[in-house]
Structures are given as C-alpha cells and as structure tokens.
Design a protein with these regions (language model features):
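Hydrophobic alpha-helical segments
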Residues: 2-207
Length: 207
C-alpha cells in the first residue's frame, strides 16, 4: 500500500514514519507518527492537496510547529492551485521571488514545475532581468510587481491600476498574497537551511 493511500485511510504501522534528522538543516523532519493527533488532518491535507506520497522537506520542517503548518499550508494550496493565473505566469512570479531572496531550494523546485507546465526556456533565462520585466502583457507586469514587492519597494498607483485591469480585484489580491507567501516560505527555508534533494539539478540564478 502506498504512503498516500495509507494517509488517506489512516492506516499506518508503528514504524511507517519516525521523526528524522535532516543533514545540514537546523530542524528535524516531523513525520506523521510524531504529529500531534489534533493536527493529523492538517498533515494529511498537505499530502492530499499536493498529490504527494511523502511530506516535502519544507512542510516536514514547518510541522515542528503543527499550528503553523495548519495555518500556512492552506494559503499555499490556494495560491498554487486555487487561482486563475496561467500556470507558467505563476511560476515566473514565484521564481522571481525565489531569486530575489536567493532561495535556491525554492528556485530549483519551481524550475522543475515551470518546465512541466510549459514555461518558455527563453523566459526562464530572463527571470529577474530588465528584459523579463519588459515583456509585453501580464508577464512583464507581474514579474516587475513580484520583484518590487519582494524588495519592499513602494508600488505606484499606475502599477496597481494595471494589475487590477489585467487580473481584476480578486487577481490583484491573489497575486499579492502569492508573492507574500512564497517570500515567507523562502525566508523560512533559508533560515532553517533546508538542503536540496540529491535528485535535483541546480540551475544557476540569472542575476
């Protein structure tokens, strides 16, 4: 039986999941067995919404504070899966944030996602550059907004108006929350020093 199926059925053996050290990190992974009973449904929901069989490092470390996991992960699920943004556009924005904050883990993971959803190789190489922000339409606008917001720069009225014109009030809110969420996650990752899994190649930052 797969771990995901076991999660959904609540069918775990005693030794299925044990909290384990993560080499190079400042925190240990919290596996399902060690998650407090009142937060097991939150732990399982992360697996369900992400379609994964094992908990990714970032969420397994976040689970050192189960209530934080319960509060943070639904926001991530919404901005990743519950918005109306084009998939490639979403990844350009996330990767802009990751590069600004020098979060290699987030950059690498979303590079893979970006390729999977059909992001352009040419545009992936432009992320964070003036050329990317000069792209016509939503791409240039959204990535410029992501960079400025991550740097805590003041957002001019004409940019806010353009974002609302392109994405509507709902999309403007979703875009802002998405940038903030991935900025928060990047800072957490960098602070607790989450190592990149051996199976990933590491494309360099563009800038």
């Amino acid at each position: 039986m797969s771990l995901r199926r076991s999660v959904l059925m609540g069918n775990f053996k005693e030794d299925d999941n044990v909290t384990t050290p993560l080499e190079g990190s400042r925190l240990e992974r919290v596996e399902r067995k060690d998650c407090p009973a009142e937060h097991l449904s939150d732990y399982d929901e992360v697996l369900r919404t992400r379609g994964m069989e094992t908990m990714p490092h970032v969420f397994a470390l976040l689970a050192n504070s189960p209530a934080a996991l319960a509060a943070v992960c639904p926001v991530g699920a919404h901005v990743r899966y519950g918005t109306e943004f084009d998939d490639a556009l979403r990844e350009y924005v996330i990767m802009t944030v990751a590069q600004e904050l020098r979060c290699t883990y987030e950059w690498v993971h979303h590079y893979v996602v970006a390729k999977r959803v059909g992001a352009s190789d040419d545009l992936l190489k432009k992320i964070g550059t003036p050329a990317m922000e000069s792209e016509p339409g939503d791409i240039g606008l959204a990535t410029r907004y992501a960079r400025m917001l991550t740097r805590n720069e003041e957002i001019p009225d004409d940019m806010a108006d353009a974002l609302k014109a392109s994405f509507g009030a709902k999309g403007f809110v979703d875009m802002t929350i998405m940038i903030g969420y991935y900025g928060m996650l990047a800072r957490f990752i960098n602070t607790v020093k989450i190592p990149i899994e051996d199976t990933y190649e590491i494309p360099p930052f563009n800038v």
